[in-house]
């Protein structure tokens, strides 16, 4: 959004050399904000200020082929698939990235409030974009939406995924790659 938060995000990305493929700041809504609450046992819960949020107003015509062509990595997540016209713009970005031979990554990143509790709708949108994706980041809970952890190798074959990283909170993470499963232990954080 064209507000203090949106300008801060834009400047921070620029300072770190991250090129945005959507250059305009949205006039129709404010920047979507996420508020994270930690429970005593370390579980996170999310609340979003997004009624509507600027991210929901990204349009297909905002996605320019030249920007995709000049990119190295195209990354998106399911939050941008939860509302039109951003969903169509996201699909276009991922499709163009694939067609142009870019590394395409995708974070399933299911958030109940953004999908109004409809995991099936999220799973349907995610499987729609998987043919364009090389690398998927998914949590163990999100894997359940897509057939479960045991289905990850089959999902990789079906959609031509190069790697899937499954995060398991305090239990670490697994990386599925080249018919192998690699494990990394969790690192204790101070969040």
Predicted features and spans:
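Conserved N-terminal subdomain of the carbohydrate kinase-like
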Residues: 1-78
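Conserved beta-alpha-beta core of the PfkB/ribokinase-like small-molecule kinase fold
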Residues: 79-154, 171-173
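Glycine-rich beta-alpha junction loops
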Residues: 1, 52, 110-112, 169-171, ...
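Short, hinge-like loop/turn segments at secondary-structure boundaries
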Residues: 12-15, 39-42, 121-125, 153-156, ...
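A short, aliphatic-rich alpha-helical micro-motif
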Residues: 67-69, 129-130, 158
